[in-house]
From Swiss-Prot:
The lineage of its organism: Eukaryota, Viridiplantae, Chlorophyta, core chlorophytes, Trebouxiophyceae. It is a multi-pass membrane protein. It catalyses: a ubiquinone + NADH + 5 H(+)(in) = a ubiquinol + NAD(+) + 4 H(+)(out). Belongs to the complex I subunit 4L family. This is NADH-ubiquinone oxidoreductase chain 4L. PANTHER family: NADH DEHYDROGENASE SUBUNIT 4L-RELATED, NADH-UBIQUINONE OXIDOREDUCTASE SUBUNIT ND4L. The gene is ND4L.
């Protein structure tokens, strides 16, 4: 198994996530999707090293990260839907106007 090719793919996914955050700082949904892409790149690293050293701990961590990421996405999207219903926009520059 050639680990360097897969790590390159994981690094590209992670850098695409960072690039997506810095490129589009106005839309919170794109930022949330970029963060999820970064989490998936980290998951891929856990899985690759788990297979490479023949240990199942990395696979368990990847499963844990997937469940946390799914919960984070669901909560984030639910908050965005409520915020959109109240304000009528989900632009990042208006989110800092929230009080409480």
């Amino acid at each position: 198994m050639d680990l360097s090719k897969y790590l390159t793919v994981s690094m590209i996914l992670f850098l695409l996530g960072i690039w997506g955050i810095f490129l589009n700082r106005k839309n919170i949904i794109v930022m949330l999707m970029s963060i999820e892409l970064m989490l998936l790149a980290v998951n891929l690293n856990f899985l690759l090293f788990s297979v490479y050293i023949d240990d199942c701990i990395g696979q368990l961590f990847a499963l844990l990260i997937l469940t946390v990421a799914a919960a984070e996405s669901a909560i984030g999207l639910a908050l965005l839907v409520v915020y959109y219903r109240i304000r009528g926009t989900i632009a990042v520059e208006f989110i800092n106007l929230m009080k409480g």
